[in-house]
Amino acid sequence: MEERSDSEPTPGCSGPGPAPVRDGGGAHTWAPEDAWMGTHPKYLEMMELDIGDATQVYIAFLVYLDLMESKSWHEVNCVGIPELQLICLLGTEIEGEGLQTVVPTPISASLSHNRIREILKASRKLQGDPELPMSFTLAIVESDSTIVYYKLTDGFMLPDPQNISLRR
């Protein structure tokens, strides 16, 4: 393998080199600046947030692609929350609806009740409407790029009646 002379770490990146690489703890670390996504404008925008490491940026980018391409969300933007060291995605699932906060996280991450509460509060600020109930969608990303979404709220939420199918 040829060594690159310009292999300085990118801000927010754990280091140069192709991805994925498995470290001793079994978790994946990614540094895909040589891959096509390393030149994608949204990936570069996430890197410029200078939050977290290459793994967090990679996971956020995978969730972004899933929301835009598979789930056909109308608009998705990335926002950094420096005090929580998080990259969040803000978007609208359907044009004209309110903003939703999506928090990409690796499957290996552990979230305490306090951490979830901090994310709920930050999400409310990002959505800009203090009247809305505190909520965010947790996007859990597996090492094979499988993504599972869970909506977390502050307390119980009744389901939207139009989304309930009637049984007969």
Swiss-Prot record:
Region annotated Disordered, chain positions: 1-32
Keyword terms, alphabetized: mRNA processing, Nucleus, Phosphoprotein, tRNA processing
InterPro entries: tRNA-endonuc_su_Sen15, tRNA_endonuc-like_dom_sf, tRNA_intron_Endo_cat-like_sf
Recorded GO CC terms: nucleolus
GO molecular function: nucleic acid binding
Residues where Phosphoserine is found: S7, S165
Signal peptide, first to last residue: none
Gene Ontology BP terms: mRNA processing; tRNA splicing, via endonucleolytic cleavage and ligation
Subcellular location: Nucleus; Nucleus, Nucleolus
Major site of localization recorded for this protein: nucleus
Keyword S-adenosyl-L-methionine: no
Oligomeric and partner information: Homodimer. tRNA splicing endonuclease is a heterotetramer composed of TSEN2, TSEN15, TSEN34/LENG5 and TSEN54. tRNA splicing endonuclease complex also contains proteins of the pre-mRNA 3' end processing machinery such as CLP1, CPSF1, CPSF4 and CSTF2.
Described purpose of this protein according to its UniProt entry: Non-catalytic subunit of the tRNA-splicing endonuclease complex, a complex responsible for identification and cleavage of the splice sites in pre-tRNA. It cleaves pre-tRNA at the 5' and 3' splice sites to release the intron. The products are an intron and two tRNA half-molecules bearing 2',3' cyclic phosphate and 5'-OH termini. There are no conserved sequences at the splice sites, but the intron is invariably located at the same site in the gene, placing the splice sites an invariant distance from the constant structural features of the tRNA body.
Family according to the record: Belongs to the SEN15 family.
Protein name per UniProt: tRNA-splicing endonuclease subunit Sen15
Organism from which the protein derives: Mus musculus (Mouse)
